[in-house]
Every structure is written in structure tokens, then in C-alpha cells.
């Protein structure tokens, strides 16, 4: 409760800073992706090979910029960064995803810091495992022009592993399929539990995430979806009133 009371006066200033970023980044016309028509061709989800956590001051208040790929070590780094910066009011996210379970763990760490807001600023993209870090926030803000991008979580994208199992013969392929099915079922259960705990509608999984194809094919190359402002609010992904 102490964190929530301390941060409340800062929310307006941070929102103004995010709004300024929105006006600066939203001016250029965005080229859309023909394969994924709801999304831009080149989402700005950072090229950092591991997520960098940088405390900065925006609008007179401290925020934590979380930018880059999610790796297994992120939860520990995030916990340390928040402990070292107890006056951080918001976490701003852009990421191409990465380790799904590390994303879930990082989201739970954010939720354990009561009153810590997560934000996807205009022009920034939060994809795949980044979704679950974002959903740990309370409240959660997606600025107009910010991108919450989903896909079907899968291990079938590891083509080298699949090719190797096929080369080894039928039994190896059967074992790989069994491993994939087991891991997919476990991850789906974990994701479902996570959404319940974070207050996000489980329909986000059934109506959006699980409706995306795991792999593109000759007829339809779409594998990801960018949610609209209406959708992120209807599924309670964003739960602010800004």
C-alpha cells in the first residue's frame, strides 16, 4: 500500500511524458505488414539481445525502461532493478519476446510491487512473452500507437530440432511430438492461471492467441495479431481510463 500511495501523485506527470512521446512517434506514416495486416512491417520491439533495464526520469517521475529480448535471467535482474529503484512508478516495455516462462515470472514480480504501472508507449511493441510482463502491471496502459502483439506459443518453430528428429527416424519424431504436446499443454495451463491471477479475460487466449497459426503456410502467412485499443480494453489487457 505504501508504494501505491507514494506513486499516485506521479501518474499524471508520467502520462504527460508518454503523451509527448506519442505525439513525436505517431507523426510518421506506418507501413503495414502484408503477411500480418493488423501489424506494422517493422515493429519497434528493440534489437537488444537481452532485455536492458534502464531507470530514467520522464515528466518529473522515475520510470524503468525495459527493452529487448527476454531471457532466463530477466526475473532476477528485474527484481534487483526494482529493489534498487523503489521510487520507480512505471515500467515501459518494448520487446520481441523470448523465454515464455521468464516472461511469466517477470510479470509476477511486477505484480508483487503493488501499484506499479506497466505501459507500452506509442510506437513501441510488446510481443509474445512480453505480453505477460505487461499483464503484471496494475494498472496497465497501452498508449494510442502502442502495440500489444500476440501469437500462438509453440515449439514447432525450432526447425533444426524437427529436421534432426525426422532424420533419426519415426520413433525419434514420435518422441519429439510427445514432448511438444506435453510442453504446450503445460504452458497453456500456466498461461491460463496467469491471466486469472492478473485479472485479464481468459478469452484473450481462446479468442485471440489460440486462433493464430503457429506456422505460416503457402495460403496464409499470418502468424501474429496486433490488438486494437478496443480489444485491449474489452479483454482487460489495458485497464486504465486514460
Residue ranges and their predicted role:
Residues 75-79, 103-107, 130-131, 135, ...:
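Extracytoplasmic/secreted envelope proteins and their assembly/folding machinery
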Residues 38, 47-77:
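STAS-typified acidic loop motif
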Residues 87-102, 117-123:
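Short, glycine-/small-residue-enriched flexible loop/hinge segments at domain edges that mediate gating
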Residues 13-23:
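Bacterial N-terminal signal peptides
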